[in-house]
Amino acid sequence: SGFDAKTQTYDKSTWNYAGADGSVIAITEQKVAEVGAHPEPASPPPALALPEKLAYDFSLQHPHCVFQLLKKHYSRYTPEMVERITGVPKEQFLKAADLFTSIRKDGDMKKAGTIIYAVGWTQHTSGTQIIRTAAILQLLLGNVGRAGGGVNALRGHSNIQGATDMAGIFDILPGYLKVPTPTDTSFENWMKRLTPKPAKPLAWDSFNYWSNTPKFAVSLMKAMYGDAATKQNDWAFHFLPKVDRNFSWAYIWDNMYRGIVKGIFAFGMNGVAIGPDSQKNIDALKKADWLVVGEIYPDETSEFWKSPGITADEMKKIQTTVYRLPCAGFAEKDGTFVNSARWLQWKNAALPLPGDAKLDQEILARIYLKVRELYQKEGGKFPDAILHLSWNYTNPQNPALAEVAKEINGKALADLEDPLTKQQIKAGQQLPGYAWLKDDGTTLCGNWLYSGSFTEAGNMMARRGTEDPSGLGIYPNWAFSWPANRRVLYNRASCDAEGKPWDSSRKQVWWSEATQKWAGNDVPDFKADSKPKDHMGPFIMNPEGVGRLFVPLGAMADGPFPEHYEPIESPIENPLHPQQSTNPVVKKFQTEADKFGTAKDYNIICTTYRLTEHYHYWTKNNPMNVQLVPEPFIEVPAELADKMGIRGGEVLKVTSARGVYQAKAMVTKRIKRMTIDGKETYQIGIPIHWGYRGIAEDEGKTARTPANSLSPTVVDPNAYTPEFKGFLVKVEKA
């Protein structure tokens, strides 16, 4: 498709399937005008417009079928090309490829293989597409929907999954509902954009479960605004903010650096240390009017003015007002952890609150109630969204989390009856699950995916049953797994077309002729009464009913198939296409702080990582962890150490285009010299856990700049994750 160099975007209008009649529905993608000095206005997701009847070819021979396009696209990725790009010898790559694909040797469908990844994949300017590549491989191998299969993330925090589920990112509402944009002028228009129509090939059917989006959205609005959300006032749709630009992490800090964002709440987030280009973040905080920090320890963000290198004169010029609130630690509060398998596990507080510490919900509630009071007294441009927020908790100043969890689960606002089973739920009762949600205002639910987690039977998240009859690690009575306590998503794919498990000794779900329904050791991820002869596609959340080797509708900013691009800073040009070495839709931030180096000046690759003995920036306040690894180091490959005469324990100075970092050398054989596209290349590694605040730094006596003083502020164009895993530096003895 056409690439617009000015806007750094593709024309995505043809990123779609062909219709059975040969037509292709063009995608309509409306642009949002740029606001202020913001570098990247966001566009609303394109309308979900797949052809009603899709063209298909079971022979996989049509030159435009997805399979043939996929083969053509990846025909350039020969084992020799893989070696040129990655430095992995051809023989090692082939050995790994043969091992993983051997599970399907001779057509054997019994085995399953998983791909497990962490931020080593995500923290690149093509990170989302790297994970997409893994998904394509797993789809081709039949490893999706299988116990022991899938693409599984190892999280860097114990509740990343829960934070995302509950809209911890700017472009979604709870339950992964896309936020409204200024082009959504009514609830109806918003739902039309979000709700996909089924795209059914003549050969199979589609459940298209996202067609229930209006039920999820109306129930969410009732949870948020209660009686103020009615059909007559468009379900309070106009109370919702209309997101007109990118508000992801890097953009917020960039806007603070530009003077657009005047203040920030930093809760559970050491922004100076965790973000790219620590110095830019420090300079951004210098320009802020106020900073509110909610932490259990002082950190680099709450005391940003103590950064090494800030002079007394500079400190006098800083006018930022800092409020540090006394928060509770994880062991001092109850709530839930949600792991990567989507298990909602309830925990109880193990310790009393120390001193003046407050629970998170009390801090947030008191801030909200004070803001509401100010709007009541003083008015404002648009107070309705604040004044009408539903806040009917027993203790408004400090809501019990169990009460909040019940609200998230959902309840009936009127008497309900299932038309098929005649089961009834009385008004005020907890909902058994999301299948009961309505779009007429008779149900309330804070997150449709969590419905079923706190029912009339009690707190399902607190269950601790260890029985596992299947032996597959399903443990159906341990906690609650969204959605519907289902442990393996798309588990219909664990059976053949006739509904028989691929592996009869490891049965997940199956079609029961006796009951004429799907049954199993897991909750079937399928329409319960859809017979195998109905040929319903197993991927019920996609309107086409099948897994996506090709991503239609412009859902990915950089292409329907993944493509390799070099990091923004790389020692080589991209062997696949040197004329476009880096991801073309990645937008660099445009301030004087945003500097990028070249291999001419910076000849070493640097990556950052975490250690087993430390947890981000918090355990450096724990004496036991500090005893295990008391100080940072720079991991240097033995070959580079020999070349430069570096000995273990010598202090090194590492410099990037953005900053300088010093620590002792640790010479290892873990990191190897690489030959990338014929060029001898070296890489160093720096753990991220240290800075200038904590007992590990001897309360400032051994303070240093954070490791991320070196990394660039540049992000993946889909998930907006910074590129921490590959940038250029030079290494010298200090």
Where are these regions (language model features)?
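Flexible, glycine/charged-enriched surface loops at secondary-structure junctions
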Residues: 108-114, 145-154, 377-386
